[in-house]
């Protein structure tokens, strides 16, 4: 009887690490990020924002063109709904490298549209969520 209870235990939520460009998707392509992720993943998930990604968004919100500053500010507001994870990384570490290390450590998926980062993640068998045909989200890899 105990074994039956184990079979029906809920799975832990999927961890999804967000790259900065993933947070721009709702504003650039008018896509409801949360409902698209709900439809795509079909189970509980937890959005994770790493401190280097947040710092990158804050830098974009304070510098650059008016359009970029506005988009970055909106992305930061959306990022408030995510679990914030503080990483202790050297200043010289690239954001992409921090994302890759965190994905390995947390055994998490990554949501990014960066082709180079997607390729690097797929090379180490990390599932990647990305925007397909500017209209919907897709997964590359096994969840």
Whereabouts are the PLM-identified features?
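Domain-level signal for Mg2+-assisted phosphodiester chemistry and nucleotide/NA-binding surfaces
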Residues: 1-83
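Nuclease catalytic cores that cleave nucleic-acid phosphodiester bonds
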Residues: 53-143
């Amino acid at each position: 009887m105990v074994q039956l209870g184990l079979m029906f235990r809920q799975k832990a939520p999927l961890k999804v690490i967000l790259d900065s460009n993933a947070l721009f998707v709702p504003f650039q392509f008018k896509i409801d990020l949360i409902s698209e992720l709900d439809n795509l993943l079909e189970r509980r998930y937890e959005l994770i924002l790493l401190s280097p990604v947040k710092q990158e968004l804050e830098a974009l919100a304070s510098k650059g063109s008016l359009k970029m500053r506005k988009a970055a500010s909106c992305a930061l507001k959306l990022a408030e709904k995510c679990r914030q994870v503080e990483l202790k990384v050297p200043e010289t570490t690239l954001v992409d490298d921090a994302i890759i290390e965190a994905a390995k450590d947390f055994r998490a998926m990554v949501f990014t549209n960066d082709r180079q980062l997607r390729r690097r993640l797929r090379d180490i068998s990390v599932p990647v969520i990305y925007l397909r045909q500017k209209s919907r989200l897709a997964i590359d890899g096994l969840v």
